[in-house]
């Protein structure tokens, strides 16, 4: 949901105080339900609370209202964050991220609403962690580094690693400041 909120803020289709009706906590798309974890939903809440409460219906409404018929703009915004690029950690079996695009054959009417709250995409925990670390690192997403061993305390041996930047700027400084504050309330 963090990536979704960043996309919406970057494209200025939402502001944090804008009120969204999460209905009764349930939305129907082509016979499939999107539900909030809270039975009965949250009613009308602002975008900041949608993020804080992790409202699936709220995120879906923000994204479908803003990007219906413009799905490519939303997906391209995610791609611009760098989340569709492999990290290449050298770990055997590490999958490439999969973020569907409207130009692909498997794109359908459920793709946009599902993606808005993290369904229908494939990211490993390390890919997600790298993204969150990028937010904590003032927008700079860095490739994780793994140590094979460490030296004993007091030893003169130490390791120095070159920082490998995946994306120097996930989003604008304005959006970064907003989402950093939002994350403090989660």
Where do the language-model regions lie?
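Beta-lactam-recognizing serine transpeptidase/beta-lactamase-like catalytic domain environment
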Residues: 3-186
């Amino acid at each position: 949901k963090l990536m979704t909120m960043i996309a919406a803020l970057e494209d200025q289709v939402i502001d944090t105080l804008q009120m969204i009706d999460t209905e009764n906590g349930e939305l129907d798309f082509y016979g499939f339900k999107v539900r909030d974890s809270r039975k009965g939903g949250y009613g009308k809440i602002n975008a900041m609370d949608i993020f804080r409460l992790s409202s699936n219906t709220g995120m879906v409404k923000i994204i479908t209202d803003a990007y219906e018929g413009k799905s490519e703009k939303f997906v391209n915004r995610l791609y611009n964050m760098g989340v569709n690029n492999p990290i290449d950690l050298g770990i055997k079996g590490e999958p490439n991220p999969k973020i569907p695009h409207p130009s692909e054959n498997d794109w359908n009417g459920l793709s946009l609403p599902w993606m808005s709250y993290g369904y229908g995409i494939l990211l490993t925990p390390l890919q997600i962690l790298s993204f969150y670390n990028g937010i904590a690192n003032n927008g700079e997403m860095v490739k994780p580094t793994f140590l094979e061993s460490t030296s004993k305390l007091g030893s003169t041996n130490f390791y120095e690693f070159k920082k490998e930047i995946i994306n120097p700027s996930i989003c604008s400084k304005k959006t970064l400041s907003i989402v950093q504050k939002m994350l403090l309330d989660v």
